[in-house]
Amino acid sequence: MVWLPPAALTLAVSLTGVSRAQLWRDELATWSAATRPVGDLVRLAGTIDAATGPYYLLMHGWIALFGDSTTALRLPSVLAMAATAGLTARLGERLVDARVGLLAGLLLAVLPGTSRYAQEARPYALATLLAVLATLLLVEALRRPSWARWAGYAAAVAALGLTHLIALTLLAAHAVAVLLVQWRDPAAAGLDTPPDGAERPADSRRRDDPPADDRPDVEPPGDGQPGDARPGGEGLGGVRRAGRHALLRWLVALVPAVLLVGPLVLVARGQRSRQLDWVDPARLTDLAALPGGVAQSGAVGGLLLGLAALGAGRLGRRALLPAACVLLPVLLVFAAGVVVPLWVPRYLVFTVPFGCLLAGAAPAGVRLAPALAVVVLAGLLGLPDQAGLRRTHEWPRSATVDYRGVARVIADHEQPGDVIVFSPRESWLFLDLGTAYHLGSRQPRDVLVVCDQRQRADLWAGECDRPAECLAGAGRVWLVVAGWRSDPAAAVPGAKGAALRDGFTVRQVWPRPGLTVALLTR
């Protein structure tokens, strides 16, 4: 039951204030996509966001059952992160021992980054869960090979690719483990430790362990004779023989992922320039900022990095798989990000549990109380960021975008026949989606729209080419613009701005964090 405390703690922390921060721009994209009919959702994937299409389809079914409130939209991510913490503990137990697993899971539970992505209606929490699950299933398949275990691994990898394409860089770490088992033996990959920790190296003895002479007798691992597999482990010779086919079985297990994810990759590749046009090329300084980025706290990220380095040294070869699961995806995405716009820290959140596993090994050699004090320290260091991420999901956290506040102003002052105009329209701020989410059927008519998001199979609506004509019948216009503007109409460019300034007068302006809403009349 080593998984239970981390899972329960993660669930409790992640549910705290889960709906306090309003949906931010990426979550608004999820809401817009997932609330469309399946046919329109498929068409959207052909235009933009194909890589996230399977997640949108999952959320479409979820919303049909549980609705689209902020809590309902984020609950799948909360559950996924809670399960991730439990599986991280289980993976640590399988690779090292129960104490390392417990500490790893608890560290993951208290990270601000865990709460941040647990409280977001995006695929990162689910991808993190599948990354840990796939790695755990790989360990099981390499230790006790069977087609059922390899089939489970194949399903997890395929689901991982469908959820988050970049998370498939994890397969580089899996390949290292498989090749070491194939060419040498499980010990070379750090997979020879019995899951119950029956034998630990001398350097891994905890201070509260009894002296060697006082320990109960434990049978040594099997000597490789036929049938010499004991509960919780198996004969090393038997594992070696099974390892002869590890590479072939692993490659076969990747076939479903190739068949399912391959077409998605081809479509997503064609959308890259539009999807990631805001991403800058990767720089070396980005690597230094990564721990704080994925942990959502510079202090906690630094602590986690230091603990992981100490833990890796303590674990020796048993650190190989978790260390590879951190380093290889990071290096691969960084190398690709130098050439193409790909380097976004949150894309690497799936590596965090493996860093926690290494970090959990650092204090595992002391008594439980001091070891837990390290977890408490990480939690205390992250408290300011925990509070901040529950205020807003924008970054920096001072850059709040208050869609809810704008919607409240309009709801309090609107009259029948009012219309609404947004500027800019084609922006990642999704001004129209933000107000539509909070106002629902009460939102004034979007007067300039001639082709809405569903009709365009896009995340943005299309506006009329002659704004003055489209505004001809309007008497009162609600204008929503990005940023603080003392004269909102003057901030609207082009023909749209000219039509507003020539035909209307600004009657009242309401500044809100990140936005300005104004009422214009003839």
Predicted regions and their residues:
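Intrinsically disordered, low-complexity terminal tails and inter-domain linkers enriched
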Residues: 182-245
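Membrane-proximal helix-loop-helix interfaces that form the catalytic/acceptor-binding platform
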Residues: 2-190, 238-522
